[in-house]
């Protein structure tokens, strides 16, 4: 596990110990509606899915909130969650029966399967004390790894630079530059959603046209 993953593990473990299974427990503040909106954006990657119960890997799954939310929206998934935070994974495994959960770092974990979809909700919005250039490299590795694990597509969110205030602990990337990088380095089948009322955007990358 690299230094960034270790830093994120400590940060999110502490937040979950303080706040439990909630939006504050994953460091998204007290407004639960914002968390649900982020879930909707992640599930948007399966909007064009025709087969029943597609497989989905949730990178940085936390306490399995996305899995539980999908059930409330009548979206059937063969759901797998992976996270580096021990206390979150233990809670998810004990309380979210509809998902499968594993403790580990997606960058080094040896999976024995692929997934139709891979999503990452929140990891690439935090840099904590990591220098921006190192976080850029981490993001590139993570996005490539996610795409290598998917059969159909991936989704992830990042803080936008189109803001009038920056927090030192958050990770911001210019949406135009990130779009161009993904287009040239990952896939030409790409969508960027900058339309929703949070200071972030979601990118969707697919192997084929949708």
Residues covered by each model-derived region:
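Conserved alpha-helix/loop element of class I SAM-dependent methyltransferases that forms part
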Residues: 33-52
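Class I SAM-dependent methyltransferase SAM/SAH-binding core
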Residues: 57, 65-102
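Conserved glycine-rich SAM-binding loop
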Residues: 62
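Short conserved loop adjoining the S-adenosyl-L-methionine
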Residues: 108-113
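A short SAM/SAH-binding and catalytic strip from SAM-dependent methyltransferases
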Residues: 117-133
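Conserved beta-strand signature within the Rossmann-like core of class I S-adenosyl-L-methionine
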Residues: 150-158
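Class I S-adenosyl-L-methionine
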Residues: 166-210
